[in-house]
Design a protein with these regions (language model features):
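Extended, low-polarity segments enriched in aliphatic/aromatic residues
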Residues: 1-24, 29-39, 45, 50-58, ...
Length: 351
């Protein structure tokens, strides 16, 4: 990894006496697909050698779980191996104890006028992302832009991002298992008189936990428009995070699970470990990672794709859209390019 980032030009950034926010997802306890702390420690050590003052950071979550406040979040991070000793730097929850410590960054975007970004990330001099590249049930995949836009948003910011992404229930698929009811943090789901899950949209915040938990494809995202709008907003939040800051991005195309690391479980990887990629351009990086996964062979390990019909013909097909047909990840990259975050054109250089 160190050889890769040096080849990609990270040493061109002046790190001396600069606070560097290393934005990483600590993983929900129980999930085993997140980036291991060994990589974070190596990056922190490199940054220190360049004169930086690095810290690992993430913002609190909107949904129920063990990362919705700073106390539980830090305990979860430690449980997954992230602490000042193992990571070689401090661990800071960027939006504070209850997710209320944020700054509004005025960008006057088409969808978001003043994104709410975790204060510690705003106060940092430099932003460096370490991204686990994988599928995502609401955005198609999660990579650099997802880690920036959604990951750096405060709890209130996440509410704004999810405001157009409410799920629906395919009633014919519901098995009355009650798992979505038990795990909804906002008491927005109940079983109706027919024992079918029903969503109260006055309470639903669109976090997507029910979509991730449902084993029967009963809870699904509404339509392609909601995924597109969410990806547009994520791009604009990413712009707010990176505004006037030197930045660098590293994506781990390893343990490519079908869904995000926010849940306390993970499905089997869909493709072999494909390596690590790095760039100054988060848009080009996401596009390159997507293409690499799309063109990779599927693992024959009883995963989401290998269990699907005609799986032997999926090499070169859009694996993310096959897993999450209601999503449109391309829309997010196109909008990010439109607002000047980067370009989808790239050159792959193997190190």
């Amino acid at each position: 990894m160190e050889r890769l980032v040096k080849r990609a030009g990270i040493t061109n950034i002046d790190f001396k006496n600069q606070f560097v926010a290393i934005k990483i997802h600590f993983g929900e306890p129980g999930n085993l697909a997140y980036i291991r702390p060994n990589y974070a420690a190596r990056m922190a050590t490199l940054l220190r050698s360049l004169g930086a003052k690095p810290f690992l950071t993430d913002c609190n979550t909107l949904y129920s779980g063990r990362r919705s406040n700073a106390v539980d979040h830090l305990e979860s991070a430690m449980e997954n191996g992230f602490n000042p000793i193992s990571a070689k730097c401090e661990v800071i929850i960027a939006d504070g104890l209850k997710g209320t410590d944020y700054r509004e960054i005025e960008i006057n975007g088409e969808y978001c006028k003043a994104p709410k970004i975790g204060a510690a990330i705003v106060d940092a001099d430099i932003v460096l992302t370490m991204n686990h590249f994988k599928g995502h049930e609401q955005t198609g995949f999660g990579g650099a832009l997802k880690n920036l836009g959604m990951g750096c948003a405060s709890v209130g910011g996440k509410l704004e991002l999810h405001s157009a992404s409410q799920p629906i229930v395919a009633r014919e698929n519901c098995k009355s298992c009650n798992i979505c009811v038990k795990h909804c943090a906002h008491d927005a789901i109940h079983l109706d008189g027919s024992k079918i899950a029903t969503i109260d949209y006055e309470k639903c915040v669109g976090c997507g936990q029910c979509v991730a938990l449902c084993q029967y494809d009963a809870a699904v995202m509404g339509d392609g428009d909601t995924s597109e709008r969410l990806n547009y907003k994520i791009a604009e939040y990413s712009k707010a995070v990176l505004l006037d800051k030197p930045n660098f991005h590293i994506s781990f195309i390893m343990n490519v699970s079908p869904e995000c690391d926010c849940w306390n479980h993970n499905d089997a990887a869909i493709v072999p470990d494909l390596g690590i990629a790095a760039s100054f351009d988060p848009v080009a990086l996401d596009k390159a990672c997507a293409d690499i996964v799309i063109n990779a062979p599927i693992l024959e390990t009883g995963n989401r794709l290998s269990d699907s019909p005609h799986h032997d013909h999926l090499e070169g097909c859009d694996k993310f859209h096959i897993m999450h047909p209601e999503t449109n990840w391309q829309a997010g990259l196109e909008h990010a390019e439109k607002i000047g975050l980067g370009t989808q054109e790239y050159e792959l250089i193997t190190v």
